[in-house]
Structures are given as structure tokens and as C-alpha cells.
Amino acid sequence: MRRGYYGVSLLFLILLSPPAGGQNTRSTPDERYTVAFASVAPLNTDIFIAAGDGSDARPFLAHPDLDYNASFSPDGRSIVFTSMRNGSADIYRAGIDGTPLQRLTSDPAFDDQGVVSPDGRSLAFVSSRSGQADIWILELATGALRNVTNHPEGDFRPSWSPDGQWIAFSSDRDSRKLKFQFATLQTTEIYLVRTDGSGLRRVTRRDALAGGPAWSSDRKRVLYHEAEISSLGPERGPSQIVSIDLATNERQILTDDGGEKWSPRWIAGDRVAYVSRGPNGGVEFVGGTKGARGDVRSPAWSADGSRMVFHREVDSRWPPVRPGPSREPSFRLVRTGIFPSYSPAGDRLVVNDQRLGRLRNSILMMHPDGSQRSVLFGDAERSALAPVWSPRGDRIASGVGRFFQGLQGPSTADIAVMSVDGKDVRILTDGSANYGFPSWSPDGRQLVFRLAGKERNGLVIANVATGALKTLTAGVAHDNFPSWSPKGDRIAFTSDRDGDYEIYTIRPDGTDLRRLTNSPGNDAHSSWSPDGEWIVFTSVRGGFKDEMALTPFNPQPNGDLWVMRADGSDVRMLTDDQFEDGTPSWLPMSRRR
């Protein structure tokens, strides 16, 4: 199973140390819960229609929820696109003027990247409804569905051959899965398959990223973008546009300069268009001609090349406080900033103020609806991560320091306790290691937190009154994100002691260690429900749902939210999208509606 590439961004770096399953018995919860979480998904994206060079762009069906990955029908009269306007990602169709709007798929699973067949009768798309991202075909007249690829790994970006007999797609089924601390890199190759699922053929063998395929009009070549693994970090390296002969496998590199180049398409014969990214990015054409500048994502052109559609982010206000779609009605979701924590009365919320990849984080306090925001704590030299309210609501604990090893100064951080006005800050640790991610005991007398340092890894419990420290776990394994049960009897945490990261629980006296998850890939960010009956966590078990290079940079684009009972049973999926969802916490029971 795939695991995300954790590069230099917040949800990755907080997991790193400085250098050196239950049964699926389902029952309906007696209570209705609310989980707050952070996501690297765009706040909102809209689709735009423009001239073939990207000029004269105008919004198409602007909506407060995500619309993206649009493409034209073969006759150019309609547009199919993905939207989350009704919760989960589904595929819609509308005329060029936006009417009539028709929902083509309706499933709690992730449906995306839809393209209509050359005869206009079928829709190929990516769906997770079988448990991973596969290529599916929907017969538009009858609604009949079939899974074309049906493989345990991820298949993405379908493209119809001009005769409608074949589909080209990218897949990470042969990914190299190089280990990089918390996760692995996703690599993809280009494949062909007949529409009945037969004749599977691997086209590229680059052991890197080959994706976004598109057919030539004579069916002899496939166009795609290509990049080395080293180009997929937060500072993206160069990528190129390549054409491959399907008969001889001869590659022709169509570009050779620096910068990012993605999503190539043949338009109006042999002309090749693509998009570039960066401060001067926009629409490009092989040969040097430039189109409109600006952020252009997932472009598609009409058959004659006179029009194009694309999406871009249209809202950047941060942090958000808004409802999120949940696959389980008993567990409502609220998207917030990183590391949300509610006061015991539920009348105030603290979060970190920055998005991913920022070295300095302050703590914001606000009302639960996001209003009345103010900076509770900030420091010019140190970052404050993972604030958490005390059970009595009179104090807030947080990690404070330089968490990002190898970037700016030594990677040391401490555990701080402050009053709810951000004053009276008291440091509990000695500054000799990377301490972080505190969690209160139910009586408010102790804190459990992560210790990481040279030859020092584990979990530590501190007496808040005296500052006395007690080792809970220690060893070469990386134990992280402890969460103290409201019942007081167990502490949940993430550990790689048995290979990849899984969720464990342990008694506060260090006895009775139990492993709760046993899934290929990493499980992390565990948090107890207010009644101690459930644990929410992030897992990559659902795999990638798109090429990671085509999503806004985040190191784990396949992290979804899941819940399970306190003993690891009754595991349920809450989110199902192509973005990283993480750092969950719970709204107090008294604030549930």
C-alpha cells in the first residue's frame, strides 16, 4: 500500500526526530460526535473557461465548495468536472453556459478526473469505491458501471484513445516506494488498457514520475509529463514534456529547460500545449509561444483548440472554520487550522496560525465559529506547535521551540504551560531535546509528550506542579503524538516500533502495551473522543488518489481520517479525498448540536 512523501512541510516535520487491528463489527454510536481537523486541500477552487491561450478567462459555475478537474465533451458543448458541492467528490456535467447541471456520479467514495469517450456515450473516471483509486467506466445512457483496472495500487488520469478502444492512464502500481523517514515517494508510470480491462500494457519504465497521458490523433503516440523523484519536494524541480512512440517505445523530449511543466495536450493537430508553474507560470506551447500568465491547474482544451478549461484557487483566507463532508453521519467534521483544541466549555478554540511549510507558528484563539480571532502567543525566534487546553480550562500547554531540524539552528523545543491569556508562561523541560505535542491527564495534574533527540526517543510524563519527569516509553523507535484518554486509564500514541507507523495504547504506568492498528502504510495523529469510547486518527491505508505532483504540495496527499473503538475495533472511514487530512481533535460533548 502506498505511503505519502513527507517532505519539508509542517505535517511532516513535526513527526521527525532530530538526526541520529481490530474486528469490523459495526454499530451505530449512541451519541453524535464532532471532529475538528486540518487539511491541505485548497480552501476553494473554481473552474474557468478561456480562449485557447488562456486569455479572457471567466468563471464557470462559481461555487463556495471545490470545483476542479474539468474537461470538454468531444463535441465541445458541455463540460464534465469534479465538485464537492454536495459533500463527497462527485462528477457533474453542464453546458457551456452552466445549464443544465447534471450529477453523473453519486457515491460516498471519491469520484474524480472524469473524461467523456470520443462517441460521447461513456465516462471514464477515477474512483475509490472499491477501496483504492481505480479507473472506472460509466455508461451515460444506462448508468451501468464497471471497474476497468481493479488493482490494489492507485490508477489515475484516464485518457481515451481517439477510437475509444483504449485508455491510457498513470499508475503507482510499480512505484519504487523509497523510504524517507515517515513515508515513501510516489512514482508513477504510463499504462494502456482496453476498455474491457484486457490488454494491459506498461508503456514507460522511468522509475520516476510519468503522468498526465494524452493520445495523438493518429493513436501512434502518447504525450505525458515526466520528472525525477528529486523534483517532487516542496521546492519543485524541473519537469519535461515527453512523447513516446507506442510501436517502438522511442521517447522524444519536447522541452529541455528548467521549471515545472505539467498536463500536456495535443490540440488542433500536432500542436502541444501544457501549463507551467511558479511566479511566471501559465499556459505554454511547445516551440516557445506563451499564453496567459497565472495559476492554471488541470487544463483541458476543446477539440479545435479554441477554448480551454482549468481550475485555480480562489480563496486563501486562513485558518478556515467550516463544515467538512463525513462518510459517517454520526461523526460530523469541522475543518480548521493545524492542531485545533477546544476549551472544555467549547466556547473557544485555539489553533496554529500558519499553513504548511512555515517555520514560525503562533497560537490563535477564536470563537468556535472562527470569529474574534487574536494571537494568544507568538515568538519571533520560536515556533509554538500543538496547543491544547487543560481539562479545567484555565491553562494551555504547547510545544515551543525550533522543531525543524537542519533548517534554522538546533532542533530543540520545550513544553510550555501558559495562562489562557497567553501570559505566565512556564517551561517544564530543560531545552536539551525536541519535546513536543503535549496531552493533559484528565485531572490536569500531568502532561504526556514526545521526546526526541540523539539516542533519546520516547514518551515522557511530567508533573505539572513540580516539573518532575517520568519516562513512559524509551528506545530506538519513534513514539509520537500521545493522547491521554479522558477515562485516564490509557494513552494512545503513534510508533514505528514494528515497522511503519501504527497506533498503540499503553497504561500511564508503562504496562499493558497494545497495538490497535495493523495496516500497510502509516497511521498517526490519534485523538480520543470526549467520552473515551472512540479514537480518531489519520491513515494512508486508502492510498494515493491522484498523482502527487498535480495536487498542491503536501507530503502525504493520501492521508484520510478514520475512527475506531478504543480497543481498535469497528474501524470507519470519515474522509475520502486526494488531500492530506490530519491533526484531529474533538468538540466537547457539551457543544454538540
Q: Where in the sequence are the language-model features?
A:
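Bacterial N-terminal signal peptides
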Residues: G7-S17
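Short loop/turn segments that connect beta-strands within beta-propeller blades
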Residues: A51-S55, G95-T99, E139-G143, R194-S198, ...
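A flexible loop/linker signature enriched in serine peptidases of the S9 family
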Residues: S39-I47, L61-L66, T82-Y92, T105-D111, ...
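Beta-strand-rich domains and repeat architectures in extracellular enzymes and scaffolds
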Residues: Q23-G52, D56-R58, A62-F72, L333-A345, ...
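Residue-level detector of Asp-centered blade-edge/turn motifs that repeat once per structural unit
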Residues: P29-E31, P74-D75, P118-D119, P162-D163, ...
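Hydrophobic beta-strand positions that form the internal "hydrophobic ladder"
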Residues: V35, I79, L123, I167, ...
